[in-house]
Design a protein with these regions (language model features):
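ATP-dependent small-molecule kinase phosphotransfer cores
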Residues: 1-27, 54, 58, 66, ...
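RNA pseudouridine synthases
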Residues: 1, 36-39
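Short glycine-rich anion-binding loops that position phosphate/pyrophosphate groups of nucleotides
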Residues: 34-36, 53-54, 109
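NTP-dependent small-molecule kinase module
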Residues: 61-69, 85-86, 90-149
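Short loop/turn elements that form and flank the Walker-type P-loop nucleotide-binding site
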Residues: 23-25, 41-43, 97-99
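Short, well-ordered beta-strand core segments
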Residues: 28, 44-48, 101-103
């Protein structure tokens, strides 16, 4: 649903403005299929998080099962394949890895391992919880934070 809705140009333009305004006003962590390429192309840390379609389908299947929802694993996997194809081939902001994004394939990783890998990527770029990069210190003293995480 989100994929189809975000393909509407007016919706995309409005969301783009909202997301950029949010990032300009505070340190943020954003998740989305075009955050690193379109929304925040100058973000300090970009992670292109992926997993095989079968693993993603199984994760979604388990999530739905835990909520007590009836679902079919094969249909879920087909939906994921179709969404990926639609997003990779859309005219506006197609799904792709940003050139400066770290590729993180979580197919064989636990949630804790994924979090650790992302934290290590942030730390390697000089970011730490509750702090700002030294280059942004002067701006933050004036109440303006330009860091985008």
């Amino acid at each position: 649903m989100a994929s189809a809705t975000s393909a509407i140009p007016a919706v995309r333009a409005h969301l783009l403005e909202l997301q950029r305004n949010l990032a300009a006003s505070a340190n943020v962590i954003m998740d989305g299929r075009d955050i690193g390429t379109c929304i925040l192309p100058d973000a300090d840390v970009k992670i292109f998080l992926t997993a095989s379609t079968s693993v993603r389908a199984m994760r979604r299947y388990r999530e739905l099962q835990e909520k007590g929802m009836m679902c079919n694993l094969e249909e879920i996997e087909q939906d994921i394949i179709e969404r990926d194809a639609r997003d990779m081939n859309r005219e506006t902001a197609p799904l792709k890895q940003a050139e400066d994004a770290m590729l993180l394939d979580s197919s064989d990783m636990t949630l804790e391992q994924v979090v650790q890998a992302i934290l290590e990527a942030a730390f390697s770029r000089g970011l730490a919880p509750g702090s700002q990069k030294a280059s942004d210190h002067a701006d933050s003293e004036a109440g303006q934070t330009k860091e985008e995480v």
